[in-house]
């Protein structure tokens, strides 16, 4: 029996996601033995700096992709939002399983909802996308950077100077913690999620036809199409981690893709937002980018990048 070595980051969430995919493949009767190999990525090592300052795409995937290209591992399960818009030659996304909840959530120390947080309340996030949208709706709140995996952030909320933190719902749901800790699910009108949020990407080598055939059985076409539209939009905007960019697509009753896309200034004072629909994921993503660029979003991105480079 062929042994499939699965690369994973060391966090509880990463290992939970990896084991979930392995379990699904076992249930389908995949003729493989599985072994998980833990890999430390650059993003895991740098925990005292915001992701936007570290810069560069693929902070949580590059080392894993190297291991795959070198034949040390055969596949890896990533959070889709960590995936760069373009994959290295020789690697592909073998499948996109059904999407988990796409929302961001607020977890507050005193169980106050977003609208009821007192003026001057300190909200923890390490995401420019989240902080920009939060400040756009509530400029009276204070943003304080917070890094670390989910358990670390939940501990910091209780023990440090935070009134609330914002996390992705999906990770909490996958860990089985959602019911115990979430104060409020934030609507996409308040906080549009990151591109790919809530979805997984199972990556493998392009020439591994046997494994690809089994991975395809886990693929969810609706999630795949929606996420493709989001990722095409992101690629066209050339934002990276240094710019507040958000995008969420779903499939409507007519099987059309409906994508809402957003670009903002870090202080939340400038926001460009468009909703585009259509049947072709690439066209929908491209059209959303075009509309935002025409309205001035590209000029904003260039300005943000210039300011980052000067720091």
Swiss-Prot record:
GO biological process, any: protoporphyrinogen IX biosynthetic process
Its EC number(s): 2.5.1.61
Cofactor: dipyrromethane
Pathway(s) this gene product operates in, as recorded in its UniProt entry: Porphyrin-containing compound metabolism; protoporphyrin-IX biosynthesis; coproporphyrinogen-III from 5-aminolevulinate: step 2/4
Catalytic activity: 4 porphobilinogen + H2O = hydroxymethylbilane + 4 NH4(+)
Keywords: Porphyrin biosynthesis, Transferase
Enzyme superclass (EC): transferase
Annotated GO MF terms: hydroxymethylbilane synthase activity
CDD domains: PBP2_EcHMBS_like
Job of this protein: Tetrapolymerization of the monopyrrole PBG into the hydroxymethylbilane pre-uroporphyrinogen in several discrete steps.
Family: Belongs to the HMBS family.
Subunit and interaction comment: Monomer.
NCBIfam families for this protein: hemC
Protein name per its UniProtKB record: Porphobilinogen deaminase
